[in-house]
């Protein structure tokens, strides 16, 4: 039996023993060495050859990732590790560190129970580190810490052991501060990382060595020996004395939970259904004999197998030929092939039980985040994405005959990556693709050209603005065209506390199932409890409340009212841009008794016009997306960089100096950031290292707002003059 067959046999055996499984991820700031770490773990576990690891970047198997040297898609690999005489199956999901791909990180967190946080010893904890730690803890994922690139402290910065220890302590303190801030109450203390118990390891993923206190105690290897070998450049001996994969995977097995342990506390948090039901108990106990439930975390399109859905099996067993329900899309499907991962390749299996990461084909309508089950159940909570699409490009096929394929290609892209939004502009016939940043869209468009071979014209990137209001409106009446239905509403600006609670997932998006509980939370955030009890729907950071008393037939049209509310929020009155931070309250209504007179054609315009008219009476304003920019540069380029930022309406938020290196943190409007990459490169002769992340929305200065509204309206083929209250409010 060859090495490969042995490995497959071992994986088959271990996947049936959930206490021997660890589902983990690696998360870090861009370029802190995450993919190099995962490759060297794979090599150590015998999945790829050692010489290639680190240079090979197995997980970056998309040619774009290898060209750009960053990880774009979270891929999954499995490996076997022996700890204290027992074999363990470790499923490792690699996640991107670049902010434009934050959606992948969020989805991967759903499938894993533990995460290795990688921090560069030279740079320390960075903004993106904070983002990934927050995402992990929000999904109840337990962290351990790997401090990487320690060789640079020894060789480049020439620090003494004492200085290095100080550097490590600071990083550990910073990470623990994040855990303290974001971990669930009951785990704030328990999940702190400590050098003494081995939940912290440090080393060099590139040179393939690592140390932890338990490893040093067990083997007698001293830190000073490692320093000497590093200074001599004897990497081979280093690798043999302190092999990276042994130290890191030992830490994983010892400190990160198996699926049986993890599901006990994760399921009640991630799943909204009844924990005491049969399926609830099966998931709590990770029971392979229960009803099958899995959550899809990623869809990839494979040239041979078609759509492959990767996901986590929470209970039961996934078998080929099984008939399943896709809960969110409300469709049935039949599972065709079932497999698990070995390295990056999929190995077909007959069946895969609870606690594993599975790859299946046959779920044609599934999207990432879909709950797949043997029978209809409550879906898992919606995935929370950290940022939202802020940049749009318009796409047209150069050749008209490619149009049907372009539509199909865009549909597939949006399925693979739910953080992409695809919209067809009915008026111009253009396809609008919105993403989380310039790089995100660039990568997706490259994929579209390469995988589908379609020639396309792409517009300059356009920023997605938001519309909002600054004061409460008076009561406004909306009438249906047949005048038989009337709705009386007011709109109010949403307080920041409530908006942030929605963004952090404390207040759920979508139709509200348990208004009393949500009202309690809203009351804690300062809303009047009596008003809050009327909460019906939360949509893209806006809220719809029913504060009527005893209106007949209102329930019959509530779904239509919510649809109309969504339409009004998708396109605001100023420039048809999405609306944010608006609370719409229905105060009173008259609804016709005969449902012929209260269909969509009557209700939609009534509620939509009323909301837009009320917004025009509430001092409507435009918001624009901002980016946080983190730049590392040699000290002498300080002036050039701050000029570059202030020219772009940006502000410096913070500056830190370590040795010769300055770290500048700034915020600037996305609209001004196009072409920043080239500008910063020439301003610093290519010496700047920089990354960006979404920094929310800020109000557009008044002197620019009118001009921007005109530009947006012109681009959309509307009358360029900004509308007045008279234009929007009907003359009833």
From Swiss-Prot:
SUPFAM superfamilies: EF-G C-terminal domain-like, P-loop containing nucleoside triphosphate hydrolases, Ribosomal protein S5 domain 2-like, Translation proteins. InterPro entries: EFG_II (IPR041095), EFG_III/V (IPR035647), EFG_V-like (IPR000640), EFTu-like_2 (IPR004161), G_TR_CS (IPR031157), P-loop_NTPase (IPR027417), Ribosomal_Su5_D2-typ_SF (IPR020568), Ribsml_uS5_D2-typ_fold_subgr (IPR014721). GO terms for molecular function: GTP binding; GTPase activity; translation elongation factor activity. GO terms for cellular component: cytosol; ribonucleoprotein complex. The modification Diphthamide is found at residue 597. It is found in: Cytoplasm. Pfam families: EFG_C, EFG_III, EFG_IV, GTP_EFTU, GTP_EFTU_D2. Residues 19-260 form the tr-type G domain. GTP binds at residues 28-35, 94-98, 148-151. Keywords: Cytoplasm, Elongation factor, GTP-binding, Nucleotide-binding, Protein biosynthesis. Its main location: cytoplasm. CDD domains: aeEF2_snRNP_like_IV (cd01681), EF2 (cd01885), EF2_II (cd16268), EF2_snRNP_III (cd16261), Elongation_Factor_C (cd01514). Catalyzes the GTP-dependent ribosomal translocation step during translation elongation. During this step, the ribosome changes from the pre-translocational (PRE) to the post-translocational (POST) state as the newly formed A-site-bound peptidyl-tRNA and P-site-bound deacylated tRNA move to the P and E sites, respectively. Catalyzes the coordinated movement of the two tRNA molecules, the mRNA and conformational changes in the ribosome. PANTHER family: ELONGATION FACTOR-LIKE GTPASE 1 (PTHR42908:SF3), TRANSLATION ELONGATION FACTOR-RELATED (PTHR42908). NCBIfam families: aEF-2, small_GTP. HAMAP family: EF_G_EF_2_A. Belongs to the TRAFAC class translation factor GTPase superfamily. Classic translation factor GTPase family. EF-G/EF-2 subfamily. This is Elongation factor 2. The gene is fusA.
